[in-house]
């Protein structure tokens, strides 16, 4: 979508972890995981405007984060060395995905920047080269570059497409920010879940999140949100939190529950997607 001042708008959808298991700790300090990643239509909008002077400018960093530390800025900087010319860009972020929520908003913004600038700057990187680049920014970035619902392993960079039934999701965000680093270093965190032999949507059920019990213990507000949403369906935490979600087969059912919980919490009604909106552009 073109707007008056030459910026162009690009979507950056959120994700849910429908299943998340920690299968081991790596020597580099990261953890190996297995997870089902699902795209949803809750999304940020990334506005980009090309420059020909090599400058990268992020106009509205999120939450006081320095420009150089923002994932979108870092994504552009990382890709710039592959550009054919003196390429630059201006970036604006219209945030709709809540931060610190386990929905991958910052990672999705960064992935959108990589996908678009790879074309604009004529970098010529393949999807898997971009995925490798994205892994240096964060464990969720590769999935958004992959652009389809997936079973992820490794630290999240090994991806296999997965068919997920069409569902609607009610998402609630408790008034707390969960520290991912704190959860991953927690002594009682499950780190030895068995690896899946035949990972399919059906075979992995019942779904679980190995971080959930630790987060509930350390952040009672997340437990309260889980308890509330569990009154209406099978609730689960996404990522390392803080958001809790429940899946429904029909939009009307999801909407009715959304109306119930939106008076108590910051809440969202989202539709599952089969692929990244940029793949349709």
Swiss-Prot record:
One Gene Ontology term of the molecular function aspect: 4-(cytidine 5'-diphospho)-2-C-methyl-D-erythritol kinase activity
Pathway(s) where this gene product acts: Isoprenoid biosynthesis; isopentenyl diphosphate biosynthesis via DXP pathway; isopentenyl diphosphate from 1-deoxy-D-xylulose 5-phosphate: step 3/6
Active site location: 15, 140
Top-level taxonomic group: Bacteria
EC number(s) reported in the record: 2.7.1.148
Entry-linked InterPro entries: GHMP_kinase_C_dom (IPR013750), GHMP_kinase_C_sf (IPR036554), GHMP_kinase_N_dom (IPR006204), IspE (IPR004424), Ribosomal_Su5_D2-typ_SF (IPR020568), Ribsml_uS5_D2-typ_fold_subgr (IPR014721)
Stored SUPFAM superfamilies: GHMP Kinase, C-terminal domain, Ribosomal protein S5 domain 2-like
Pfam families hit by this protein: GHMP_kinases_C (PF08544), GHMP_kinases_N (PF00288)
Binding site for ATP: 98-108
Any one biological process term the GO annotation gives: isopentenyl diphosphate biosynthetic process, methylerythritol 4-phosphate pathway
Sorted UniProt keywords: ATP-binding, Isoprene biosynthesis, Kinase, Nucleotide-binding, Transferase
Segment forming the signal sequence: none
Catalytic activity annotation: 4-CDP-2-C-methyl-D-erythritol + ATP = 4-CDP-2-C-methyl-D-erythritol 2-phosphate + ADP + H(+)
PANTHER family per UniProt: 4-DIPHOSPHOCYTIDYL-2-C-METHYL-D-ERYTHRITOL KINASE, CHLOROPLASTIC
HAMAP family, alphabetized: IspE (MF_00061)
Role according to the record: Catalyzes the phosphorylation of the position 2 hydroxy group of 4-diphosphocytidyl-2C-methyl-D-erythritol.
UniProt record similarity statement: Belongs to the GHMP kinase family. IspE subfamily.
Protein known as: 4-diphosphocytidyl-2-C-methyl-D-erythritol kinase
Source organism of this protein record: Neisseria gonorrhoeae (strain NCCP11945)
Organism lineage string: Bacteria, Pseudomonadati, Pseudomonadota, Betaproteobacteria, Neisseriales
């Amino acid at each position: 979508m073109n707007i008056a001042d030459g910026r162009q708008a690009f979507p950056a959808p959120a994700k849910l972890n429908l299943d998340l298991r920690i299968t081991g700790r790596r020597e580099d300090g990261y953890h190996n995981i297995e997870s089902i990643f699902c795209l949803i239509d809750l999304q940020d909008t990334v506005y980009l405007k090309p420059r020909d002077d090599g400058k990268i400018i992020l106009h509205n960093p999120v939450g006081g984060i320095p420009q150089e530390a923002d994932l979108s800025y870092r994504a552009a900087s990382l890709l710039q060395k592959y550009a054919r010319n003196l390429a630059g860009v201006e970036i604006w972020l219209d945030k709709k995905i809540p931060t610190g929520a386990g929905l991958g908003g910052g990672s999705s913004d960064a992935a959108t920047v990589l996908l678009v600038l790879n074309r604009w700057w004529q970098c010529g990187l393949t999807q898997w080269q971009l995925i490798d680049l994205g892994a240096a920014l964060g464990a969720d970035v590769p999935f958004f570059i992959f652009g389809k619902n997936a079973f992820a392993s490794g630290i999240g960079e090994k991806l296999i497409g997965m068919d997920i039934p069409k569902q609607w999701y009610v998402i609630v965000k408790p008034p707390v920010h969960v520290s991912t680093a704190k959860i991953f270093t927690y002594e009682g965190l499950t780190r030895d879940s068995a690896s899946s032999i035949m990972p399919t949507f059906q075979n992995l059920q019942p779904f679980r999140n190995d971080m959930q019990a630790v987060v509930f213990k350390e952040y009672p507000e997340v437990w309260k949100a889980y308890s509330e949403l569990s009154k209406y369906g099978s609730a689960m935490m996404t990522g390392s939190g803080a958001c809790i979600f429940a899946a429904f087969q029909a939009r009307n059912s999801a909407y009715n529950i959304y109306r119930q919980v939106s008076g108590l919490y910051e809440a969202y009604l989202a539709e599952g997607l089969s692929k990244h909106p940029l793949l349709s552009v």
